[in-house]
Every structure is written in structure tokens, then in C-alpha cells.
């Protein structure tokens, strides 16, 4: 897959959108039907669907975000998380959570 052009802030496009859900099994069944595929990751703490290179995630932890689309969180795809955080901070962005490894070779920051 060709790499997308990186913008001046290091952002390449949305990588993931994660919805907090109250009923993980019901949401999993709904989205499996809606996107016509099974999740690639299916655990009690998270369900993930790969939809042509973008992730739809379902998170049963609603302690910090309200369930449904209003509580959804989008994550950007970048080449270098630490460098992108630095560059976005320089132009007025705020890093809420420093870059950290979250498993599977993935690093994230908020």
C-alpha cells in the first residue's frame, strides 16, 4: 500500500475511531453485520474491526467517555508519534497523554 502524503503537522489521516459502548456483545453483532465482516480482535476489553485499513473499535469502558457517537475518539495515523507531538505542540497543540506503547507494535498519544 503506498504511503499517504504526510502534511506539515505529520498527520497522514484518521487511523482509528473508537466508540465507547454499554453492551459490547450487542455492538459487536451490530457492527459485524453493518460492515459485513468479523472483528480481527475480539476480547472482553476491546473489539476491533479492520475496515480497509481503518479501525472501528468498540470499548466497553465508559468511565471517561459517554457511550455512543458523542463519546467517540478518533486517532490520527502518523509516521513518528513523538515527532508529531513535538511539532503540533510548537503550533499550539496540547499533548494530554505522552506517547506510549499499547501493544502489537503500536504507539499512541493523546
Regions found by a protein language model. Name each.
Residues 1-10, 14-22, 47-50, 65-110:
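Vicinal oxygen chelate
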Residues 12, 18-56:
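Core segments of cupin and vicinal oxygen chelate
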Residues 35-40, 75, 98-100:
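Short linear motifs in intrinsically disordered
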Residues 41-42, 59-63, 101:
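Acetyl-CoA-dependent GNAT
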Residues 55, 64-65:
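Short, surface-exposed beta-strand-loop junctions and turns on beta-sheet-rich folds
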Residues 56-59, 110:
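Conserved beta-strand in the GNAT
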Amino acid at each position: 500500500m503506498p504511503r499517504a502524503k504526510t502534511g506539515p503537522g505529520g498527520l497522514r489521516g484518521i487511523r482509528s475511531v473508537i466508540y465507547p459502548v454499554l453492551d459490547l456483545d450487542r455492538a459487536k453483532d451490530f457492527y459485524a453485520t453493518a460492515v459485513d465482516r468479523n472483528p480481527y480482535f475480539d476480547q472482553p476489553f476491546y473489539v476491533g474491526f479492520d475496515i480497509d485499513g481503518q479501525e472501528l473499535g468498540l470499548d466497553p469502558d465508559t468511565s471517561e467517555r459517554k457511550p455512543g457517537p458523542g463519546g467517540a475518539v478518533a486517532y490520527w495515523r502518523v509516521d513518528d508519534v513523538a515527532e508529531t507531538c513535538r511539532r503540533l505542540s510548537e503550533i499550539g497543540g496540547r499533548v494530554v497523554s505522552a506517547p506510549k506503547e499499547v501493544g502489537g507494535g503500536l504507539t499512541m498519544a493523546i
